[in-house]
Amino acid sequence: LVKSSAASDVYKRQEFLKLDLNHPLRNAVEEEYALQESFKIINKYKSKYECSRAILVGHNAFFDHSFMLEACIRNNIKKSPFHSFSMIDTVSLGVLATRQTVLAKICKELDIDYDNDEAHSAAYDAMVTAQVFCKIINDFDDINSSIKC
């Protein structure tokens, strides 16, 4: 049973996130095609670096990973290039490095530019998340020395 308030909540979230599902630049492709093409690229790099599985890195990576797995099921894709349960979550890394969980706040603490107007687009969020991951990993020794248990 779908309540009208649920539809209203979805609309409010789209407004808050500035999502325009009918935007002409959206260039949506079929989900199966997008997955297959993405997996081809990932598999190419897995082969190049002799990896058996790719590790998903993301902000709230468990959320993204669950969507990816469900998309594979929907499209009858039997083998994802990603490890089935291992991933690296920049929320967890962000807490250790900055004591923050919100991507914008983590970026601020790490001196990474963050544009609220660009936020929540897949490409922008992926780029910023990659910057956060690299900054934390590359500065690990400095960050590790400041952690007190």
Give the location of each predicted region.
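Active-site-proximal helix-loop-helix substrate-binding element of RNase H-like nuclease domains
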Residues: 9-18, 22-24, 90-126
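Acidic, Mg2+-coordinating catalytic module of metal-dependent nucleases/exonucleases
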Residues: 55-61, 66-67, 71-72, 104-149
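Conserved DEDDh/DEDDy metal-dependent 3′-5′ exonuclease domain
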Residues: 12-92
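Ser/Thr-centric signal marking residues that sit
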Residues: 4, 90, 129
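Single conserved hydrophobic/aromatic residue that forms the stacking wall/gate
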Residues: 1-7, 11
